[in-house]
């Protein structure tokens, strides 16, 4: 079944889920319950209602991660040269996503090593088993045309390939490199991931945002579902 067909068969939203547009409209009971739980510094918190999927959702910004059990909450992010890793424990119906900007550089969620530690630890605290984890990898696009000698996306992809191999976490699907920015959606309970390559017109805006964040970082003190990829 295509994603569009799946959307057509999706059940209508219950009255409590017919939320307003934008982040401020989220008032469902499940989101209130999630917000009431203790949160880590780098855990995503931009909740909204996704009208296309008729689900509550949380959008990950650079440096953030999120873990959830079940498919009642959609995890989403938009990537340029950044990389997002989705880790899934199907037996536990548990999954999570992160979004990192650079391979290494300190103890912050925007750096790959720490981003992976946050995600793996978050999953294991919720009952995941390390030996059951599977990975889906997205992003690393060459969207920053002014970077002729250093391709940040390639560096990010090379890092995560090496990291997952060293940790013996199998990669069951991936959509990386190329020149396109991407939107990624994860249904954490089933592990189903959707990826949409965005138009070239959107690449410059995403690249500018990433460049601005990287510029700020350079001035800051260093701190210590099966394997197929579905398009939508």
Please report, for each region that a protein language model flagged, where it lies by residue.
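Short acidic-hydrophobic catalytic motif
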Residues: 1-82, 91-94, 100-104, 109-134, ...
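Active-site-proximal betaalpha loop/short-helix elements
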Residues: 85
């Amino acid at each position: 079944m295509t994603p569009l067909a799946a959307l057509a068969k999706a059940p209508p939203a219950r009255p409590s889920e017919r939320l307003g547009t934008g982040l401020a409209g989220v008032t469902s009971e499940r989101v209130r319950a999630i917000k009431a739980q203790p949160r880590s510094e780098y855990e995503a918190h931009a909740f909204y209602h996704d009208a296309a999927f008729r689900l509550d959702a949380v959008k990950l910004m650079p440096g953030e991660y999120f873990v959830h059990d079940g498919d009642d909450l959609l995890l989403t992010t938009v990537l340029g040269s950044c990389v997002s890793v989705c880790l899934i424990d199907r037996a536990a119906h548990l999954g999570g996503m992160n979004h990192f900007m650079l391979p290494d550089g300190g103890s912050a969620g925007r750096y790959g090593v720490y981003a992976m530690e946050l995600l793996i630890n978050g999953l294991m605290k919720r009952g995941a088993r390390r030996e059951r984890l599977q990975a889906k990898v997205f992003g690393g696009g060459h969207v920053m045309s002014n970077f002729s000698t250093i391709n940040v996306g390639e560096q990010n992809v090379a890092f995560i390939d090496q990291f997952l191999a060293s940790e013996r976490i199998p990669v069951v699907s991936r959509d990386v490199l190329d020149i396109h920015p991407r939107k990624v959606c994860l249904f954490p309970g089933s592990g189903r991931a959707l990826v949409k390559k965005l138009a070239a017109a959107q690449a410059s805006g995403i690249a500018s945002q990433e460049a601005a964040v990287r510029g700020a970082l350079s001035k800051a003190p260093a701190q210590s579902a099966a394997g197929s990829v579905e398009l939508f």
